[in-house]
Swiss-Prot record:
<feature type="binding site">
    <location>
        <begin position="17"/>
        <end position="20"/>
    </location>
    <ligand>
        <name>substrate</name>
    </ligand>
</feature>
<comment type="similarity">
    <text>Belongs to the gamma-glutamylcyclotransferase family.</text>
</comment>
<keyword id="KW-0808">Transferase</keyword>
<feature type="active site" description="Proton acceptor">
    <location>
        <position position="92"/>
    </location>
</feature>
<keyword id="KW-0012">Acyltransferase</keyword>
<dbReference type="GO" id="GO:0016746">
    <property type="term" value="F:acyltransferase activity"/>
</dbReference>
<dbReference type="InterPro" id="IPR039126">
    <property type="entry name" value="GGACT"/>
</dbReference>
<protein>
    <recommendedName>
        <fullName>Troponin C-akin-1 protein</fullName>
        <ecNumber>2.3.2.-</ecNumber>
    </recommendedName>
</protein>
<dbReference type="Pfam" id="PF06094">
    <property type="entry name" value="GGACT"/>
</dbReference>
<dbReference type="InterPro" id="IPR009288">
    <property type="entry name" value="AIG2-like_dom"/>
</dbReference>
<dbReference type="InterPro" id="IPR013024">
    <property type="entry name" value="GGCT-like"/>
</dbReference>
<dbReference type="GO" id="GO:0061929">
    <property type="term" value="F:gamma-glutamylaminecyclotransferase activity"/>
</dbReference>
<comment type="function">
    <text>Putative gamma-glutamylcyclotransferase.</text>
</comment>
<dbReference type="GO" id="GO:0005829">
    <property type="term" value="C:cytosol"/>
</dbReference>
<dbReference type="InterPro" id="IPR036568">
    <property type="entry name" value="GGCT-like_sf"/>
</dbReference>
<dbReference type="GO" id="GO:0005759">
    <property type="term" value="C:mitochondrial matrix"/>
</dbReference>
Length: 167
């Protein structure tokens, strides 16, 4: 009798802080099994202060890689498989806009920290640091998040993230 092939089912932890959170516009991506596996694990907070801002004409929440600035950011941890991570890397334009890095997240008083993947904006115009910092993201009518399929191809989000000095 042959052995059944062992499927690698190692799951990673992913911290989400913006439109991917439960009840937010892009959470359906995590909920779709066509993108891979994702399961809510717990609520969490960053272990260091980071600036969370809403920017671009599409009101995208960005977590800037600028430790010590901003607030401790509240979000959610999901257990995800490699297929989901690849789907999210494509969604988040990994390498073009975001980078995915491993950071420790607080999971509660007395509970400690857990290492999680998180999407951070590495390169950004300095004017993003002058925007209002948030400790938690919620889609709103004052800054309505524009889903990717509703954005115009003439103006990709990265066009709003110019790195040159503005006159």
């Amino acid at each position: 009798m042959g052995q059944a092939k062992k499927v690698s089912s190692a799951l990673s932890k992913l911290f989400v802080y913006g439109a991917l959170k439960y009840g937010q516009p892009s959470n359906s991506i995590l909920a779709s099994s066509g993108n891979g596996f994702a399961k809510f694990w717990c609520k969490a907070t960053t272990t260091q202060k980071l600036p969370l801002v809403i920017a671009t004409r599409y009101n995208i929440p960005f977590l800037l890689n600028k430790p010590g600035v901003g607030y401790y950011v509240t979000g959610e941890i999901y257990e995800v498989d490699d297929r989901m991570l690849n789907s999210l890397d494509n969604l988040e334009d990994c390498e073009e806009i975001y980078t995915r890095e491993m950071h420790d997240m607080n999971i509660g008083v007395g509970e400690g920290t857990v290492p999680c993947w998180v999407y951070l904006l590495q390169k950004y115009p300095e004017n993003l640091l002058s925007l209002r910092y948030l400790s938690s993201y919620e889609n709103s009518t004052t800054h309505p998040y524009i889903m990717r399929h509703r954005r115009t191809h003439k103006h990709p989000a990265q066009d709003d993230l110019t790195y040159e000095a503005q006159n």
